[in-house]
Amino acid sequence: MLQPEGLYALEEGTALTASRNDCIICYSAYDLSVHLPRRLYCGHTFCQACMQRLDMPAHEQHWIPCPQCRQSTPVPRGGVTMLDLDLAAFLAVKAEREPSKIEPRSSVPLKISTTITQQPAGLYPTLGPQPHFPQPGCCCWGWGRLCWYPPGNPEV
């Protein structure tokens, strides 16, 4: 059956499109070891394994031509592993791989009609006893000598 060229291209394009967390060359999902997402100077991102295959020596300088736009990126002295990570893709992969570190909330639900007057226990550490600083007394010499000391002061 013949299909319109635009529709076929659209269906084919959607079938071949990689997700944001996949390398568009090898279609492998980015990971935290071999397939780290590395960014070229042009801004396109590919996995580290594919970048190493694209590394080509030319005139004693190593260059990586971008498979999408053909802009060449010089390879740093440490090799492909020294290229910048695509931070957004890296953090997305890291978030998928690591278990959630959020502490579970208490299983006791708050009633809507309950008035909250204190912080829930365990949210903030207690500071312990607070230091007591002596408060100076006050003397005024205007209409006569008027002195007072704060309550609990031993000078009274």
Swiss-Prot record:
| SUPFAM superfamilies referenced in this protein's UniProt entry, alphabetically | RING/U-box (SSF57850)
Cross-referenced InterPro entries: RING_finger_domain, Znf-RING_euk, Znf_RING, Znf_RING/FYVE/PHD, Znf_RING_CS
Query: Where are the annotated RING-type zinc-finger regions?
Result: 23-70
Alphabetical keyword list: Metal-binding, Zinc, Zinc-finger
Matching CDD domains, A to Z?
RING-HC_RNF224
**SMART domains this protein is in?**
RING (SM00184)
Give the matching Gene3D superfamilies.
Answer: Zinc/RING finger domain, C3HC4 (zinc finger)
| Source superkingdom | Eukaryota
Q: Name one GO molecular function term.
A: zinc ion binding
PANTHER family recorded: RING FINGER PROTEIN 224
Question: Under what name is this protein listed?
Answer: RING finger protein 224
Give the classification, highest ranks.
Eukaryota, Metazoa, Chordata, Craniata, Vertebrata
